[in-house]
């Protein structure tokens, strides 16, 4: 798949690809956003709008802006990858989540991913996290044994966990906590990807290099 403003990203196994800068994903007006992979419709909620920064991104106000997805039926996955670009402008805010609890959030002194609501949590300290106001490429992969975290295309560490991820009948939401509706994201949101496989370290780097000239 040709990435907006750059070379190809890995497209094998893609379930979700959303990009405000692509006409295939957003026309530039209205509230309907298309998943480029299956043409399913996501909806801009409240005052969330596209801005021209970085070729087209979403401007979340931190109050009530978010994107709501349809009910997806991706099944039970033994491996997957979640990846996104974002520029956070304040702490303690969510960017991507689903209900139940597969989610990221930015804390005052940590960055967190939860796999399946229990276990699979991974923290790293603020002195190696991406500062406020800076674009970051965040990736979590699950291969059936470990959740691995990548930042700016670089491996950060892993958390051992087992089992499968039930992505059947889930509603993905971008910009808020899917369960409670809190932790509203404040900042700019870029491309969002979900794969039905665990990307390798080389594939994570490939995707980062394909789009870094747009976002960094």
Features from the language model and the residues they span:
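Extracellular glycan-recognition modules
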Residues: 27-29, 45, 61-119, 130-132, ...
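Extracellular/lumenal ectodomain signal focusing on beta-strand-rich modules
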Residues: 17-20, 137, 191
């Amino acid at each position: 798949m040709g990435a907006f403003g750059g070379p190809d990203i890995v497209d094998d196994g893609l379930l979700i690809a959303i990009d405000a800068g692509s006409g295939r994903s957003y026309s530039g007006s209205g509230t309907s956003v298309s998943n480029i992979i299956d043409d399913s419709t996501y909806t801009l909620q409240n005052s969330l709008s596209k801005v021209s920064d970085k070729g087209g991104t979403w401007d979340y106000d931190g109050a009530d802006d978010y994107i709501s997805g349809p009910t997806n039926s991706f099944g039970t996955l033994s491996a997957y990858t979640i990846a996104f670009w974002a520029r956070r402008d304040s702490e303690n805010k969510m960017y991507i989540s689903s209900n139940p609890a597969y989610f990221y959030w930015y804390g005052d002194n940590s960055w967190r991913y939860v796999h399946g609501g229990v276990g699979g949590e991974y923290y790293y300290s603020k002195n190696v996290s991406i500062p406020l106001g800076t674009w970051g490429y965040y990736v979590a992969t699950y291969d059936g044994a470990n959740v691995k975290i990548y930042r700016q295309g670089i491996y950060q560490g892993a958390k051992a966990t087992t089992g499968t991820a039930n992505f059947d009948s889930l509603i993905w939401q971008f910009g808020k906590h899917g369960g409670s509706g809190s932790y509203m994201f404040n900042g700019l949101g870029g491309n969002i990807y979900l794969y039905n496989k665990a990307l390798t370290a080389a594939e994570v780097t490939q995707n980062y290099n394909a789009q870094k000239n747009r976002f960094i």
